[in-house]
UniProtKB/Swiss-Prot annotation:
Entry-linked Gene3D superfamilies: Periplasmic binding protein-like II (3.40.190.10)
SMART domains: PBPb (SM00062), PBPe (SM00079)
Paired cysteines (S-S): 57-64
Localization: Periplasm
Stored InterPro entries: Iontro_rcpt_C (IPR001320), Lys_Arg_Orn-bd (IPR005768), SBP_3_CS (IPR018313), Solute-binding_3/MltF_N (IPR001638)
One family name in Pfam for this protein: SBP_bac_3
GO molecular function: ligand-gated monoatomic ion channel activity
Entry protein name: Octopine-binding periplasmic protein
Gene that encodes it: occT
PANTHER family per the UniProt record, alphabetical: AMINO-ACID-BINDING PROTEIN YXEM-RELATED, MEMBRANE-BOUND LYTIC MUREIN TRANSGLYCOSYLASE F
NCBIfam families referenced in this protein's UniProt entry, alphabetically: 3A0103s03R (TIGR01096)
Signal peptide stretch: 1-20
Function: Component of the octopine active transport system probably consisting of four subunits: Q, M, P and T.
């Protein structure tokens, strides 16, 4: 009887330790930035970052909950401890680094313009080219100058408080009328309604949106841009959560090395966005 009691106690102790060691992480996403993250039928969250978050949580041996949060409040709610991490196509920028910390990158950011196919802007030069604002700075600046001249006097929509809005402010302010929106869906609607001449956003998001009936007639134009203001995409974290950062870093590194990020990239974007 004593041996049985001791064994039962030992099993309960081991089970208790295992439960205590299991991490519980709440991850916020925007839920309106397809195909990175979006709300599907019944409000279920889906997309590249939902799949990747689940894969990372499995590698971290963590129990994760993914919640939707409006973009405008996504960083304040993190610092206010409403959740533990952000996976919402958030690029790492110096301004954001003043407020929160970041994991190592899990995706590269590539951005471009979209217009309606019957617009004169559909002939924007540079289609098929991709310029890095870092390693191809001179070529990128020339391409930007060409586009700025081409777009002169037009109205361009962009989601506010994003790297895309920063890019427009830096390179196009004065030559175009910049109109900021709360979401990509909102500026896409104004594009198709004729209230905008062009929009700038993540190219993977625009490519997915253009395939939908509500964006019929829209097309990607001009070159794509990466690096610089667009940077890389990483998990947003509170600066003090160094242990959680280490866990995410290790999981992302493993997901990059074993091809998980590439597989999910090809599934959702048809291109590999694994950081190089």
């Amino acid at each position: 009887m004593k041996l049985k009691t001791i064994l039962c106690a030992a099993l309960l102790l081991v089970a208790g330790q295992a439960a205590a060691q299991e991490k519980s992480i709440t991850i916020a996403t925007e839920g309106g930035y397809a195909p990175w993250n979006f709300s599907g039928p019944g409000g279920k969250l889906d997309g590249f970052e939902i799949d990747l978050a689940n894969a990372l949580c499995e590698k971290m041996k963590a129990k994760c909950q993914i919640v939707a949060q409006n973009w405008d409040g996504i960083m304040p709610s993190l610092t206010g401890k409403k959740y533990d991490a952000i996976m919402a196509a958030m690029s790492v920028t110096p301004k954001r680094q003043e407020v929160i910390g970041f994991s190592i990158p899990y995706a590269a950011g590539i951005n471009g313009f979209a217009v309606m196919g019957d617009s004169k802007l559909a002939e924007m030069p540079g289609l098929g080219e991709t310029y890095s604002l870092d390693s191809q700075a001179d070529a990128a600046k020339k391409a930007i100058a060409d586009i700025s001249s081409f777009l002169n006097g037009t109205t361009v929509g962009v989601q506010g408080s994003t790297t895309a809005s920063t890019f427009l402010d830096k390179y196009f302010k004065g030559s175009v009328d910049i109109k900021e929106y709360k979401s990509v869906e909102e500026h896409n609607l104004d594009l198709t309604s004729g209230r905008l001449d062009a929009v700038l956003a993540n190219a993977t998001v625009l490519a997915a949106a253009i395939e939908k009936p509500e964006m019929k007639g829209a097309k990607l134009v001009g070159p794509l841009f990466s690096g610089g203001e667009f940077g890389v995409v990483a998990v947003g974290l509170r600066k003090e959560d160094t242990a959680l950062k280490a866990d995410f870093d290790a999981a992302i590194k493993a997901a990059s090395e074993d091809g998980t990020i590439k597989t999910l990239s090809l599934k959702w974007f048809k291109v590999d966005v694994t950081p190089q």
